[in-house]
Amino acid sequence: MKFTHLYIPHKFNYYFMDLISGVEKGFSKLEFLSCNTNINDDTLIGLVEICKSIKELELYITKQPTTKILSSFINLKSLELYDNSRPMSWNCLENLSLPYLQILKATGIPIKVLTSLIDHTNGHLIEIKIDHISHNEISNKKIIQTIYKKCPNLEYLKLLFINNNILELRELLINCNHLIGLYIIFEDVWDVNVMIDYNIIFKILSDNSSISLFKLKFYYHREPELKSFEFFFDNWKIRIPMRPILLQTIQYHVLYGSEHFDLIEKYKKNGIVKKYENALSENTFQDFEW
């Protein structure tokens, strides 16, 4: 029997290699591994030795893995990292090279090390999700620039755009012209005192989006004014009339007035918006579900 998926439970204290002694070949085609990094280090090392075929790795972090472990998965195509709010440097990701990585999902992981990780990929990334990590304007600008320089084939992106870096969105749209879905977290989600200029953002989107991009998700504290939405939809109709928008909005406490729904309904009838949904929680939808 050949196994393709393996899930190792939390606090697994047995030496896994002893348990599978004599049947190692059954794991030689393993493609997916899910485990907690609190398991016995020898187990991870043993798996590395026999599981060169692993393409998707899901780690539940309670202590930092070593660079040696992660760098051993040279064929890795999907990496999901979740930091459960424990303060860690995550320097194990710096200078890590995963040349075939296609999907990167990171929650609570320092931006600096994620920037380094993306910088050491070979242009195969098609999906990036980064959230729940506070960072400054400089770090935010750096990761946006790294993404549009290193990820020409990107199709889906979830990322915070700090207000002063919003002009970088133009470069991202131009360089990542295979984008299908874009999930923007606006800075006022983190700081309610920040005022977002949606006219600039919507102009950048309507002027520079490729024909492939039609799935949009906005997470903000304060909704755009009606005239900003009108400006956006009217410009989209002129530039990309054959690509109606799938739009989701997520608000932080503040509710739309009915006039916003009435406006969007008008553009649905005109064929500019294909589908619209609004929610108060980011957990209502899957990140790249429209």
Protein language model features and the residues they cover:
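The conserved beta-strand core of Leucine-Rich Repeat
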Residues: 1-290
